[in-house]
Amino acid sequence: MATSITAGLQKAQQAVQDTATKNKKIVDISHDTVNVHTDQEQRTDFGVAITDPDHWLRVTNETHSGPSLLEDHIARERIHRFDHERIPERVVHARGTGAYGNFTLKESIEDLTYAGVLTDTSRNTPVFVRFSTVQGSRGSADTVRDVRGFAVKFYTDEGNWDIVGNNIPVFFIQDAIKFPDFVHAVKPEPHNEVPQAQTAHNNFWDFVYLHPEATHMFMWAMSDRAIPRSYRMMQGFGVNTFSLVNKEGKRHFVKFHWIPHLGVHSLVWDEALKLAGQDPDFHRKDLMEAIDNKAYPKWDFAIQAIPEEDQDKFEFDIFDATKVWPEEQVPLRVVGELELNRNIDEFFPETEQVAFCTSHIVPGIDFSDDPLLQGRNFSYQDTQISRLGVNWEEIPINRPVCPFLNHNRDGAKRHRITKGTVNYWPNRFEANPPASDKGFKSHPAPITGRKRRDLTPKFKEYHNQAQLFYNSLSEVEKVHVKKAFSFELDHCDDPIVYERLAGQRLAEIDLPLAQAVAEMVGAPIPTKALRDNHGKTSVRLSQFDFTPKAPGIISRRIAIIIGDGYDKIAFNGMKAAILAAQALPFVIGTKRSAIYAQGEDKNSSKGVIPDHMYDGMRSTMFDATFIPGGSHIETLQKNGQIRYWIAETFGHLKALGAMGEAAQLVKEVLGNVMGVQIAGADSAEPVEWYGVVTARGPESAESLSEGFKVLKDAGDFTSKFFYQISQHRNWQRELDGLASTVAF
């Protein structure tokens, strides 16, 4: 039974949450929301009070417990309900998480569309967003190498509009008819159901080699885009080509983009592998944590638009989902902003039962002849019926916030009761008539041609944009692509698979890349390019082109490692500075019981209770680590896991801060690294070396927590340390070969 104090606190917290984040959709689902934290007695689903939920009705006497009785309707109901709790998981995108928020239009695009959600800047449109992986099952890990789903449901005044996108702007196939074969190939192999949530197996690489249209996409999949640091730090793309139609009936073809305010950042591969076991829920917890801490994730909403009459003016077909529209040719126009500000209350009825459809569009938005989109429009509707039943749009999370009524009736799991004597149109009462002027109208696009199974010649060019993407990457991103191919193909044990992918297909993209990968995986090393690299580059294909909208360390997770005898001044000052910068400090102790500062009397001080002890966490779960000085360093020096934590932080290219005696510990751990530079006890200024920031102990906590700025050339310790965190990683540490000299 909930205590009155607990219930009161929860009620107050809920009131604050509701006031800050309430919108039309939150109000709508509130009618179907109940709170289990109540003194209300248990009842069956048919309303009968339950007096004993712990014992099945059975025949007993003083010495013997006899058979259970099937007449126990309460027990049977509980078992029946339990036996049927699971529903079919999504065939793809099964693993996911979601949150509520709002979409705000910053600039009307009435020159392109008459859709209210894209023309009325006074609106605040509720949204639900679901992020996901593609390949794995519901129980797979968050940090696998994979495309990420980025699906947005807008609850507009004219109906629901869904952008069912990904964090990569292109796809593996051009025609939806190939989707079953592609998914079969990327999923676990049929003879043994292995591997889970990975492309590192024979069937996937066999399929993509035999489908050269997949070349561009698998270059993206081998890049850092496929291992994002956070859902909050990845782009989103509509992938397909849609249409916008304005009041004059003029049509533009468009692509949709989401650009994160925090910039685009990724994990490193070793880190992603480890997190898959250490914290398989890393991404979903990261999203919930940020929202709970009011570090609300935000994205700019942008479009690319091509007038209908210009659709044939490009070297690529604009309806080909394996191609991007280079921004030099089709500029990006930022028109809105997405903010996520409310976590879900219950996973199953909200995140698991939410259902997206590419065919969910509103007046002013239309489809195109994109052959992948045409098939998706059928598939998504069909799969929701299989998963949730024909009345899936009556489920609270899926229903629109605008009034809706039609003559659809019956079917499994129908909830709505429709009064009236007719269920058809036209009818003698003129009841529930079609919309007059405000309804959806398909654009009257002219179509000529012959019925055949084929695509236009432009679809058959597969290499130019794969080269364009690779050419546009930074040096370190190219290193990661090479390593990713080497890892993936090393897991293929059929020589024909890795030999022709490394020695032939990659030689059509970039010869040095093909040679490096072939050598690593044991394939014949190609001696000449099978296709000349055109040498062209394009902006904003490298994720390094997407820096945070404002410099800072907001929502970054920073570990502070302490043991008995830590420097209290350094600890208090750094923790205060981290909080002031709107980042998240986590105290990692040698134990999760009271830890006392150097000179503190255990009898007169409460000490500090760490958030975690070191063995319960790993450096992989944090963006940076800080270690204050003090006599506790004598204890930390003898702890192998703490030493490994420091080495792993360095190996994963993260910022590392140490003061006083801790600087010497860092130097000891990094002893094999050439040229390590740290601050000595008499150093007047902090020392920054490849993202490792050290200094002598501070004179006061305020010297750390006040007056800092996130600037590269700042002179104080905090500013230098925070700047390194803001850069996400010290990539030069990897390029100069320093990270690889440390065992981690």
Curated annotation (Swiss-Prot):
The gene is catA. Catalyzes the degradation of hydrogen peroxide (H(2)O(2)) generated by peroxisomal oxidases to water and oxygen, thereby protecting cells from the toxic effects of hydrogen peroxide. SMART domains: Catalase. This is Catalase A. GO terms for molecular function: catalase activity; heme binding; metal ion binding. It comes from Emericella nidulans (strain FGSC A4 / ATCC 38163 / CBS 112.46 / NRRL 194 / M139). Its main location: other. Belongs to the catalase family. Its cofactor is heme. It is found in: Peroxisome matrix.
